[in-house]
Amino acid sequence: DLGRAGVERAALHSAWDFTVASTESLTGRMLALRDGAFAELDGKAPAYRITTVIEAPDDGIRRRIEGTFDVPLYLTDGGRPGGRFVLGDDGRPTRVDGTFTAAFRCDLPATDSTAPARLALYGHGLLGDLGEMSGSLTRRMAQDHNIVYCATNWYGMAEEDIPNAARVLADLSGFDSIADRLQQGILGFLVLGRLMVHDQGFVADPAFAVDGRPVIDNSRVYYDGNSQGAILGGAFLAVSQDVTRGVLAEAGMNYGLLLDRSVDFDEYLNGVLKPAYPARIDRLIGMAAV
């Protein structure tokens, strides 16, 4: 192989082969999830359940609505951290029995506006959760611009995934469990976006009404993601059929380059990855490969 490539062994330090990315390898599985899930919906609103409605939970929030929604399941182990795709003969994920239950939160802003609020999906940061949506800056944005923010978790890279992420850092051969669940998580964002714009979704629910009138404008939904939410938000926006505009704030770069340079990663680097892979070159190649 080296000879065919015109590489002289005398000047060679090391060599290895690897597979480069293709359109199919980058997008094929995620598009299979999206197309299969929305074909299953067949134009209907996704199923959801409201579990909590809290009036004025924080400054700037008129009402907080929390609940769960159903996402077609493509992972083993019920979709829990560590679950993986079941691949068909074509190499694409196959549907698994049951559904994945995803959490959501929506905050209605306390404003004087009588116009229905625009809708936005929020994407949280590194290994966080949907609660980041309710921070002071987002609340101010919602008040100033009459926006109802809704969020779910980036399953695969959410707070509940930290134990599995630590296991993977100790053995990078298990990285597929993160990548697979993360695509299930992106599917969750797609389904929540559909729930936000569908005429039989949130806009038809009394929890999203005041004095019998809907307080949201479901004609369009936007996306707002920060840090990890900006990195993963790019993939989400690329495959979303309902969201055409979004903000990707402080996105940084792909994880293979970012993590080794991030102070937020120091705890995992020093506590798990370095002991498992003492040589820096091994760590860099491993992170680049995944």
Give the role of each language-model region.
Residues 17-19, 66, 119-122, 148-153, ...:
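Structural recognition of the beta-strand scaffold that forms the well-ordered cores
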